[in-house]
Amino acid sequence: MLKSSVIAAQYWAFFTFFFIAVSICVFMLSISWILGGRSSSRYKNTPFESGIVPTNTTNMYCSVKFYLVAIYFVLFDVEALYLYAWSVSIVECGWIGFIEALIFILFLLSGLIYLISSKLLVWKSKNNIHVT
């Protein structure tokens, strides 16, 4: 048997899955293109808020600090999930698992120390003016 036919015989399920997934995507995109509306007017791209005409723009300033804190939260939360899974199976892991978890915690602490030392968790900026 040829090497390519052996590879095809081994991976037929993957190729079938890939073909079906691409076919479904192409089918859904083509159906939406065929059945979708083609009208264009000046009101087509305006936001619709319960029939009320918007009075100002929707652009608003949001500090990047909020996004950074959200990213840090997700990172440390996922790492906490890993630690929870480790703590549930601590009996099966033994000392090797304990040492691996200790190294993982040290990596977490080094990341937290980096965030604190680079002042990425400080909320006050130099330009803050407090009005009393």
Swiss-Prot record:
Disulfide bonds: none annotated. Keywords: Cell membrane, Membrane, NAD, Quinone, Translocase, Transmembrane, Transmembrane helix, Transport, Ubiquinone. Its EC number is 7.1.1.-. It comes from the Bacteria. One of its GO terms (cellular component) is plasma membrane. It catalyses: a quinone + NADH + 5 H(+)(in) = a quinol + NAD(+) + 4 H(+)(out). It is a multi-pass membrane protein. InterPro entries: NAD(P)H_OxRDtase_bac/plastid, NADH_UbQ/plastoQ_OxRdtase_su3, NDAH_ubi_oxred_su3_sf. Coiled coil: none annotated. The chain crosses the membrane at residues 14-34, 66-86, 96-116. One of its GO terms (molecular function) is NADH:ubiquinone reductase (non-electrogenic) activity. Its main location: membrane. It is found in: Cell membrane. Pfam families: Oxidored_q4 (PF00507). NDH-1 is composed of 13 different subunits. Subunits NuoA, H, J, K, L, M, N constitute the membrane sector of the complex. NDH-1 shuttles electrons from NADH, via FMN and iron-sulfur (Fe-S) centers, to quinones in the respiratory chain. The immediate electron acceptor for the enzyme in this species is believed to be ubiquinone. Couples the redox reaction to proton translocation (for every two electrons transferred, four hydrogen ions are translocated across the cytoplasmic membrane), and thus conserves the redox energy in a proton gradient. HAMAP family: NDH1_NuoA (MF_01394). Belongs to the complex I subunit 3 family. This is NADH-quinone oxidoreductase subunit A. It comes from Buchnera aphidicola subsp. Baizongia pistaciae (strain Bp). The gene is nuoA.
